Curated annotation (Swiss-Prot):
Gene3D superfamilies: Glucose-6-phosphate isomerase like protein, domain 1, Helix hairpin bin. GO terms for cellular component: cytosolic small ribosomal subunit. It comes from Nitrobacter hamburgensis (strain DSM 10229 / NCIMB 13809 / X14). The keyword Aminoacyl-tRNA synthetase does not apply. This is Small ribosomal subunit protein uS2. Belongs to the universal ribosomal protein uS2 family. It comes from the Bacteria. NCBIfam families: PRK12311.1 (NF008966), rpsB_bact (TIGR01011).
Length: 332
């Protein structure tokens, strides 16, 4: 794996260079503005390119050191891209309303996350039958409300090590909380925004859907590169197995979509290297016949989600697949 590459042409095609109307500008962004056309400020992509590369390097370095990245984008056009990118790169996200104190009052937020986990457990088990239809509906509504706000961070387990923000004006509370806790901020900063306090500033259009999709994709790939680097630094050699192939489980006993094994093929991979996988979760993987990264790397979304449900962490499934692919590619 390597840091994701991009070109100025890609930025142009995505509309990254289009700022806001010239009368809506923030004078503090003057250094990053190339000029104006039809009363629309044009962002200087000659500066955006190296600054975006710097932000990608920061994301990769943070993840390579075992850090967590929090994607923040609550505006409508950013919600899906932020969630997809975070899941694909085994990171975390907030794409609904930012709850004040999400970072600075983590203890209270953790309590809400515990409540969300409890509701998930109750509603997905037979315990739900003990409630009346009206009570179940009330619990479901509470669960859905919590999931919208906290679903993307319920597995984070602590404060992030870096946050990536789309639209610094809209996410100003998130940025203030990060600054108060000395958490680095990488952000897309448009011509109507204040660049002050942004650790890794990237001048660019924060409204166009194509531009936002490009940013999210690049940040996700940088995070995956960091995962790959972390595994490489740990000295894991996935291709070192020289022992005979073990007998596979009968096909009828295997969930569709992956190859279950009766035992590891040679030395089993340390599945605890995957984000959120404890010794207990690793044992559940093994009970399902999963011992190696290459098995996880072959999962499609549906199969990954089913396996995630089997081991009790369905929200992490896509992230595990991304990590497994990175590890497998590193070994090759």
């Amino acid at each position: 794996m390597a840091l994701p590459e991009f070109s100025m042409r890609q930025l142009l095609e995505a509309g990254v260079h289009f700022g806001h109307q010239s009368h809506r500008w923030n004078p503090k962004m003057a250094d990053y503005i190339f000029g104006a056309r039809n009363n629309i400020h044009i962002i200087d992509l000659a500066q955006t390119v190296p600054l975006l590369h710097r932000a990608l390097q920061a994301v990769s370095d943070t993840v390579a050191k075992g850090g967590r990245i929090l994607f923040v984008g609550t505006k409508r056009q950013a919600q899906d891209g932020v969630a997809d990118a975070a899941k694909r790169s085994a990171q975390y996200f907030v794409n609904s309303r930012w709850l004040g104190g999400t970072l600075t009052n983590w203890k209270t937020i953790s309590g809400s996350i515990k409540r969300l986990r409890h509701l998930d457990e109750v509603l997905s088990s037979g315990d739900a039958n003990a409630y009346t239809k009206k009570e179940r509906l009330t619990l479901q509504r509470e669960r859905d409300k919590l999931d919208r706000s906290l679903g993307g961070i319920k597995d984070m387990g602590g404060l992030p090590d870096l946050i990536f923000v789309i639209d610094t004006n809209k996410e100003d509370i998130a940025i203030q909380e990060a600054q108060r806790l000395n958490i680095p901020v990488a952000a897309i900063v448009d011509t109507n925004c204040d660049p002050k306090g942004i650790t890794y500033l990237v001048p660019g259009n924060d409204d166009a859907g194509r531009a936002i999709s490009l940013y999210c994709d690049l940040i996700a790939r940088a995070a995956i590169d960091g995962i790959s680097r972390a595994q490489g630094d740990s000295g894991i050699d996935i291709g070192a197995s020289v022992q005979p192939v073990q007998e596979e489980l009968p096909a009828a006993a295997q969930p569709a979509g992956f190859q279950g094994l009766a035992g590891p093929r040679g030395v089993a991979d340390d599945l605890k290297k995957l984000t959120g996988v404890s010794g207990e979760i690793e044992k559940k993987f093994n009970d399902l016949g999963i011992f190696h990264y290459w098995q996880l790397a072959e999962f499609d979304h549906e199969t990954a989600h089913k396996i995630g449900e089997e081991v009790g962490l369905p929200s992490r499934a896509d992230g595990w697949v991304a990590q497994a692919k990175a590890l497998t590619a590193e070994a090759e």
